[in-house]
């Protein structure tokens, strides 16, 4: 009985003396985990984008930047990282680097679709914001690790910023595409038409008869030369010129017996003379 009680007492004493293991994760590790989750959300949004409204991608990018900036504050306000803490960051940072590279490659492959939606400039600005946030986080973590590991920490984080810089370079030429369509298509059209026509006509009429019949001569000539030149240009200028010349000449010549009155008078005079001559001849 006493022996059993002693064992129980020893057991309780041993249990109380054994330290309880409490899981302690460095704040920086939790920060990387949160950033990784939000990077996955951005990757999903980019993967689903096939043109049109890019708001889902923009929203995911803004949340990622917000998460990174929040992580920067957490690391800065947290304790210094031990060697074990720094080494614990190696694998998560490497995994995050691969995620970021995948998102950037997907963004680059869909550049034409974002530009077509006039969102190239938006993606460009989002990438710059991601770069600034990631660089701030890298500096914050490097400042917390032991000095002997600061170079290693910088090299690990450099992979993330290098991937983002690749995206920035790819979208740099689309920086001006920010939701407004711009197109320029100069066109110049020139047409020249020249039409020249010349018409010349001469008409001559001649009529001749005995002296008691009127004689008339008529001649006429006409010449017309229209010229038209038109040069239309898309800019809105045009010129035209036209000219025409016409000449007509007519002349009529009539002898002294060209009228009916003169012919009648001459006829009467001749008839009267003949009658008188006949009367004299009969009288003789």
UniProtKB/Swiss-Prot annotation:
Signal peptide location: 1-17
Gene Ontology cellular-component annotations: extracellular region; fungal-type cell wall
Localization of this protein: Secreted, Cell wall
Pfam families: HsbA
Segments of this protein annotated with the region Disordered: 176-252
Low complexity: bias regions: 176-234
Biotechnology: applications noted: May be useful for serodiagnosis in patients with aspergilloma or invasive aspergillosis.
GO molecular function per UniProt: lipid binding
PTM notes: Galactomannoprotein, glycosylated.
Family in the record: Belongs to the cell wall mannoprotein 1 family.
Name of the protein described by the UniProt record: Cell wall mannoprotein 1
Gene responsible for this protein: MP1
């Amino acid at each position: 009985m006493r022996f059993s009680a002693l064992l129980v007492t020893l057991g309780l004493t041993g249990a109380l003396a054994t330290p309880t293991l409490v899981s302690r994760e460095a704040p920086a590790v939790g920060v990387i985990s949160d950033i990784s989750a939000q990077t996955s959300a951005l990757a999903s949004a980019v993967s689903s984008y096939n043109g049109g409204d890019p708001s889902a991608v923009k929203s995911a990018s803004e949340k990622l930047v917000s998460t990174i900036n929040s992580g920067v504050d957490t690391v800065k306000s947290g304790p210094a990282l031990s060697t074990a803490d720094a080494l614990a960051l190696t694998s998560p940072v490497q995994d995050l680097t691969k995620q970021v590279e995948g998102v950037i490659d997907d963004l680059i492959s869909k550049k034409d679709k974002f530009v077509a939606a006039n969102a190239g400039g938006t993606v460009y600005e989002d990438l710059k914001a991601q770069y600034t946030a990631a660089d701030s986080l890298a500096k914050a973590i490097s400042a917390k690790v032991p000095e002997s590991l600061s170079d290693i920490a910088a090299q690990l984080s450099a992979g993330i910023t290098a991937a983002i810089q690749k995206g920035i370079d790819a979208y740099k030429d689309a920086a001006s595409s920010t939701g407004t369509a711009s197109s320029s298509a100069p066109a110049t059209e020139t047409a020249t038409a020249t039409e020249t026509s010349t018409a010349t006509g001469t008409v001559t009429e001649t009529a001749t008869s005995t002296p008691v019949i009127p004689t008339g001569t008529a001649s006429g000539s006409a010449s017309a030369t229209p010229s038209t030149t038109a040069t239309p240009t898309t800019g809105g200028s045009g010129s035209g010129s036209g000219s025409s010349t016409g000449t007509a000449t007519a002349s009529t010549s009539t002898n002294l017996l060209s009228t009916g009155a003169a012919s009648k008078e001459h006829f009467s005079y001749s008839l009267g003379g003949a009658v008188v001559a006949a009367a004299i001849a009969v009288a003789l």
